[in-house]
């Protein structure tokens, strides 16, 4: 076959065939299909084409890489050339100004030598302008007058921009400002670039050529970024002034290029002049030679004073000190907070034993500005507006750097605000669904876990700042109040049963005890915050029991209970046993009869259930509320039995009522008194007095005197 050649020769021929200018893919495929013997030839040809494709791809990658490197080098050379051309242009401009000044000086000298010739030249130039005015038109004064004239058009900048001999206008022009997020036009501004700062002013709508002050940016903290053209947005550049940025649009590409070049050159000249000034100020100045004196004691005084003069010279020409402000800007921009604080510590250590001279004060002023910027960034890192994910450890970096900057109080305040927002968000995100007890379990787990983690992180971050712990205690109390609000809203405001409320409070107390592992006991706080709601719940449930007891008393027939089945009787025995009534068998009769009234049995079970649930809620502040509620409940039953005993005329029913009264006084009341003393830890005199009042009924059952 013509195309089935060796691997090497076939590959080179195939390459030449594909690279030829007259190559036609359709004709090539048609010819290939006609000359192939079968599928195998086509597969081999396909493999050769794939190998050629891979080889071509690798060659293309190598060429792209080589060209890319050449492109980078070319762009760098162009940038260098552009910078040199601009410097050359600047030098030529200065030379032109010098030559004009020299020419003007020579003309003035010639005019002095020949007044008649000077008068003729002045009249020819401008007959209305006196010669003395032209003599005052020196280069520096011209710049100063131009700056003053322009700034007179800007309202509100006279006090912010005091005139100084070295300040002059470099460049100015109109720009359009755009929103950085939506790229929408905001306003038209006029920018004044001076040799040490950039002034931005907005145009006044009703006054042509007049402006209002908007912002002033020192060149040291200003960065210029070219914005790539993206039609219709073009001819734009961005100014970065930490922590904000602004985007401006020039009238055309030429003006944009001029702005970029002039800004960079002015920044560079400013940095060089500042560096030279610091170097000159850092050089030790020779002490003035004192006049000779015949006093022999002055020599010793001079020898003692010489070292102090040497000590006043602080060497600020070190490279790392010169670059310190820029290095701090880089660290802040790159979020290298540790590196920035390390640089500040290094500077403070270097200047610790040095005298405070004027150059040191100026350096301190620059560094203090960066410290304020760094502090603002760290404060923003700890603000609740930031993401609250990651737990309290996510704030450790910013907190530790603020503490190193000597702002532990601010770090403590921001840390606690951040954690308060995190706890509040976590509680709000809990879904209220299912049983109340299930929600309370979730609520307690979320809140107390967050509180425990915050306490441990606080102890780690502020280990050496004992003064901050009082702030944490105040924060913990405030957080506990937020937790109790959510807890009470779900448990007490929704009118849950007393048993459910007791279980929920028990869960909260158990979680609160976990904080004692780190030495934080907030039990008294949760008691103080819950006491009002628990009092309301106890009184509400007491009223329910009293109403139910009165309703049963109104329907009382004083008949024995018939439980019908042994199972029901056994169940009642178990219920009474769980209530603490161990001698209940003496009140049971034959078959399934019970020698007690249904009303008295129901009252016993309800009262003991109330006491058990109330004891789960008990703490000392609730002592009198619980005791008074018990007395009120018992009095309702006691008064009813006493009244029925005095009013009943049937001897058989009267004996049955007396049997119920005996059960109430001799069995139920001692059980209530004993259980109350076990739960509270001390006896209740009111319950003892109530039980002793039953003696009156036992001594004189026919008396009409009430037990109350």
Swiss-Prot record:
Q: Which GO terms describe its biological process?
A: exocytosis; Golgi to plasma membrane transport; protein localization; protein transport
Domain PH, chain residue ranges per copy: 168-268
Q: Name one Pfam family in it.
A: PH_EXO84
UniProt feature, compositional bias: Acidic residues: 297-314
Residue ranges under compositional bias (Basic and acidic residues)?
271-282
Subunit structure of this entry?
The exocyst complex is composed of EXOC1, EXOC2, EXOC3, EXOC4, EXOC5, EXOC6, EXOC7 and EXOC8.
Q: Give the start-end ranges of region Disordered.
A: 271-314
The record's Gene3D superfamilies line, in alphabetical order, gives: Exo84p, C-terminal helical domain, Exo84p, N-terminal helical domain, Pleckstrin-homology domain (PH domain)/Phosphotyrosine-binding domain (PTB)
Name of this chain's protein: Exocyst complex component 8
Instruction: State its role.
Output: Component of the exocyst complex involved in the docking of exocytic vesicles with fusion sites on the plasma membrane.
Instruction: List the GO terms this entry assigns under cellular component, sorted alphabetically.
Output: exocyst; growth cone; perinuclear region of cytoplasm
- InterPro entries tied to this protein: Cullin_repeat-like_dom_sf, Exo84, Exo84_C, Exo84_C_1, Exo84_C_2, PH-like_dom_sf, PH_domain
Q: Which organism is it from?
A: Gallus gallus
As for subcellular location, the record says:
Cytoplasm; Cytoplasm, Perinuclear region; Cell projection, Growth cone; Cell projection
Which family does this protein fall into? Answer: Belongs to the EXO84 family.
Q: Does the keyword Ion transport apply?
A: no
Q: What is its main location?
A: cytoplasm
Question: Keywords of this protein's UniProt record, alphabetized?
Answer: Cell projection, Cytoplasm, Exocytosis, Protein transport, Transport
> Looking at the keywords, is Transferase present?
no
């Amino acid at each position: 076959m013509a195309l089935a050649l060796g691997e090497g020769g076939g590959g080179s021929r195939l390459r030449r065939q594909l690279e030829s200018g007259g190559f036609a893919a359709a004709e090539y495929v048609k010819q290939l299909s006609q000359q192939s013997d079968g599928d195998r030839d086509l597969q081999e040809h396909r493999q050769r084409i794939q190998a050629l494709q891979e080889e071509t791809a690798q060659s293309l990658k190598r060429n792209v890489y080589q060209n890319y490197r050449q492109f980078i080098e070319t762009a760098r050379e162009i940038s260098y050339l552009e910078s040199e051309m601009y410097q050359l242009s600047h030098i030529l401009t200065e030379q032109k100004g010098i030559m004009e000044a020299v020419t003007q000086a020579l003309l003035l000298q010639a005019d002095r030598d020949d007044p008649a010739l000077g008068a003729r030249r002045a009249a020819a130039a401008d007959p209305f302008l006196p010669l003395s005015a032209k003599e005052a038109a020196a280069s520096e004064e011209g710049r100063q007058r131009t700056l003053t004239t322009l700034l007179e058009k800007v309202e509100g900048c006279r006090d912010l921009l005091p005139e100084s001999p070295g300040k002059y206008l470099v460049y100015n022009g109109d720009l359009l400002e755009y929103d950085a997020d939506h790229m929408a036009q905001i306003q038209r501004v006029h920018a004044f670039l001076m040799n040490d700062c950039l002034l931005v002013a907005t145009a006044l709508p009703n006054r042509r050529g007049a402006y209002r002050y908007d912002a002033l940016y020192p060149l040291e903290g200003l960065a210029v970024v070219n914005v790539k053209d993206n039609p219709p947005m073009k001819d734009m550049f961005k100014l970065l002034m930490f922590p904000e940025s602004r985007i401006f649009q020039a009238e055309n590409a030429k003006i944009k290029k001029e702005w970029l070049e002039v800004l960079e050159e002015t920044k560079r000249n400013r940095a060089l002049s500042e560096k030279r000034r610091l170097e000159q100020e850092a050089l030790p100045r020779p002490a003035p030679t004192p006049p000779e004196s015949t006093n022999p004691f002055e020599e010793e005084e001079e020898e003692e004073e010489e070292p102090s003069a040497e000590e006043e010279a602080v060497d600020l020409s070190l490279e790392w000190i010169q670059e310190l402000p820029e290095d701090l800007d880089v660290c802040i921009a790159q979020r290298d907070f540790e590196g920035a604080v390390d640089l500040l510590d290094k500077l403070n250590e270097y200047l610790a034993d040095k005298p405070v001279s004027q150059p040191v004060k100026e350096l301190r002023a620059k560094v203090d500005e960066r410290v304020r910027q760094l502090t603002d960034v760290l404060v923003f890192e700890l603000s609740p507006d930031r993401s609250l994910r990651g737990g309290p450890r996510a704030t450790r970096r910013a907190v530790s750097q603020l503490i190193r900057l000597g702002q532990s109080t601010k770090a403590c305040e921001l840390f606690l605000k951040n954690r308060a927002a995190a706890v509040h968000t976590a509680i709000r995100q809990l879904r209220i669904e299912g049983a109340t007890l299930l929600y309370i379990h979730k609520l307690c787990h979320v809140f107390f876990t967050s509180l425990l983690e915050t306490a441990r992180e606080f102890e780690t971050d502020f280990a050496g700042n004992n003064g901050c712990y009082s702030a944490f205690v105040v924060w913990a109390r405030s957080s506990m109040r937020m937790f109790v609000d959510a807890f009470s809203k779900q448990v007490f405001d929704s009118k849950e049963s007393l048993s459910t409320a007791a279980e929920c409070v028990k869960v909260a107390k158990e979680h609160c005890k976990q904080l004692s592992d780190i030495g934080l006991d907030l039990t008294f706080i949760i008691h103080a915050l819950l006491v009002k709601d628990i009092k309301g719940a106890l009184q509400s449930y007491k009223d329910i029991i009293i109403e139910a007891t009165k309703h049963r008393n109104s329907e009382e027939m004083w008949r024995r209970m018939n439980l019908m089945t042994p199972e029901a009787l056994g169940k009642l025995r178990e219920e009474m046993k769980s209530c603490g009534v161990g001698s209940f068998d003496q009140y049971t009769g034959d078959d399934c009869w019970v020698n007690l009234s249904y009303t008295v049995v129901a009252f016993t079970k309800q009262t003991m259930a109330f006491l058990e649930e109330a004891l789960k809620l008990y703490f000392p502040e609730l002592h009198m509320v619980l005791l008074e509620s018990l007395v009120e409940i018992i009095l309702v039953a006691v008064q009813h039995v006493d009244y029925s005993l005095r009013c009943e005329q049937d001897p058989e029913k009267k004996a049955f009522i007396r049997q119920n009264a005996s059960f109430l006084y001799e069995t139920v009341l001692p059980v209530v008194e004993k259980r109350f003393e076990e739960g509270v830890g001390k006896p209740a005199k009111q319950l003892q007095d109530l039980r002793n009042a039953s003696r009156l009924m036992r001594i004189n059952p026919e008396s009409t005197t009430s037990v109350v």
